Amino acid sequence: MDVENLIITTLKDKVRELTGNEMDIRLDEPPAINMGDYSTNISFRLAKDLKKAPKMIAEDIANSLSILGIEKIEAVNGYINFFMNYSDFSKETVSKISAEKENFGKLEKRDEKVILEHTSANPNGPFHIGHGRNMVIGDSLKRILIASGYDVETQYYVNDMGRQEAIVVFGNERFELDKSKKADHAIGEVYVETNKLLAENEELEQEILNLMKNYEEACEAGIENELTEKFKNAVDYSLGGFKETLSTLNIYHDKFVWESEFVKSGMVRDVIKRLMDTGKVVEDEVFRLDLSDYGLEKKLVLARLNGTSLYSTRDIVYHINKMENCDFAVNLLGADHKLTAVMVNKTLALLGYNEAEVVFYEFISLPEGSMSTRRGRFISMDELFEEAKSRAAEEVRKRGVAENEEEIEEIAKRIAVGAVRYNIVRIAPEKPMVFRWDEALDFEKVGCPVIQYAHARCSRILENVETISNDNLFAYEMNENEKTIVKLLSKLPKIVEKAAEVRKPQIVANYVLDVAQGFNKFYANCPVLKEENETIKNSRLAIVNTTKTVLENTLDLLGIEMPGKM
């Protein structure tokens, strides 16, 4: 029974009865349960039409309504407050979660295919924490969209044709790869050294341009030769390191799409011709696409005069390929890509395709400062994770929850994944953020350990409980802590629906912290195993059991596992 929707439907009927008109109604939640579970201000909105004071309208409406699942309706200063019957509501909530288990929070399947592109870092060095924000938000959004019923395919767009990769190929012939290091880190060292070499010897720049031109020509002709093999090997080597980092954080892509695929297939040349035929292309030192009809003053550089393509052209082709294979596409991009994203989307519109949705994220830094790949000064995601794991292991040892080093390592790894992922995803993408260790590994207030610790508490309470009797559950006057946690638990499906709808995974992150904090208040104020009244004891055990399920299901949406012990 969806009490909230029942209230809204009943109020809409009442408004129609009073005015003959429709009204869009949204309910608020009072700050404390003793003030009601839901509240509406419709009396103020009706005052003009009914020519009555809001206070009087509220009292009339409150006295005239009867809603299933609501035990009291109260008019206070023009507002109408609704109080749920928590005995029935709690039984229904606990029963639903217990029956659905790991499926609680998942919505009905939709017949819609989504292509979600995230991470897509150039294969010229390890991921830095800016890439980390992209991958964590992207993977969390993927999980939330799947839970909300979409068929989701995640893609990583591999830039194997750009200047950066040509520099890596050029450098691999002059500097030895350190095979003792993780692949992407070794490639990164070559890239940094090669950039230094190019800065000191400007005449070498022509060799980079020749590599790019020769590689594209080989791809366009469908030729596989020594040069194409060098590019393929360099990219594959770096991707091996990338996949290792991603899997450490429980992130997996369904498909790696190489930029060169679209040159080899002839699709790039076909799209350039289609754009030329629009009459919107102008020629100066390059071919440029005029998008002024879409309010863009800057022209999109489409191709060189010799016909070779540019990254922007290949990106448009990649997006056409996506749009032809999905109902809608979502991209995760840094805020510095806003203009490029708009230009790509308007080019798609010009050719008659749907535009991609874009989730932009702002920069992330550490308190020590920001990162730069090109100059070789950056904090890699691998370093960030190892630091998180080291700090987590120290905390696990201090708390004495495990003595075996192997067990400490496993617990620390799960805490570290949670610390990194949760601390990133909890902040709205459009806000710049500083990654702070005291927040990421906070066991008391805002960190993922707070949530994982609440789960560990649930597990400890339940470890020796064989069965939970369903007899007379919640057949007593529940206190505010019990009501608060049950109401929170019931919200997961709507949280998933909302987060998917607005593409904001931080909604899920904020919700799961609320659940953990609500449970901790319940735990502090409501004895469970020591409760002597069997009805109350079993009801509280049911709350603990369903809290454990909701914490597991919700953190799974964020790609985070439970350590078990903490």
UniProtKB/Swiss-Prot annotation:
InterPro entries: aa-tRNA-synth_I_CS (IPR001412), Arg-tRNA-ligase (IPR001278), Arg-tRNA-synth_N (IPR005148), Arg-tRNA-synth_N_sf (IPR036695), ArgRS_core (IPR035684), DALR_anticod-bd (IPR008909), Rossmann-like_a/b/a_fold (IPR014729), tRNAsynth_Ia_anticodon-bd (IPR009080). It catalyses: tRNA(Arg) + L-arginine + ATP = L-arginyl-tRNA(Arg) + AMP + diphosphate. Its EC number is 6.1.1.19. GO terms for cellular component: cytoplasm. The keyword Flavoprotein does not apply. GO terms for biological process: arginyl-tRNA aminoacylation. It comes from the Archaea. GO terms for molecular function: arginine-tRNA ligase activity; ATP binding. Gene3D superfamilies: Arginyl tRNA synthetase N-terminal domain (3.30.1360.70), HUPs (3.40.50.620), Isoleucyl-tRNA Synthetase, Domain 1 (1.10.730.10). It is found in: Cytoplasm. Keywords: Aminoacyl-tRNA synthetase, ATP-binding, Cytoplasm, Ligase, Nucleotide-binding, Protein biosynthesis. A motif ('HIGH' region) lies at residues 121-131. It is an enzyme of class 6 (ligase). Belongs to the class-I aminoacyl-tRNA synthetase family. NCBIfam families: argS. PANTHER family: ARGININE--TRNA LIGASE, CYTOPLASMIC, ARGINYL-TRNA SYNTHETASE. HAMAP family: Arg_tRNA_synth. This is Arginine--tRNA ligase. It comes from Methanococcus maripaludis (strain C5 / ATCC BAA-1333). The lineage of its organism: Archaea, Methanobacteriati, Methanobacteriota, Methanomada group, Methanococci. The gene is argS.
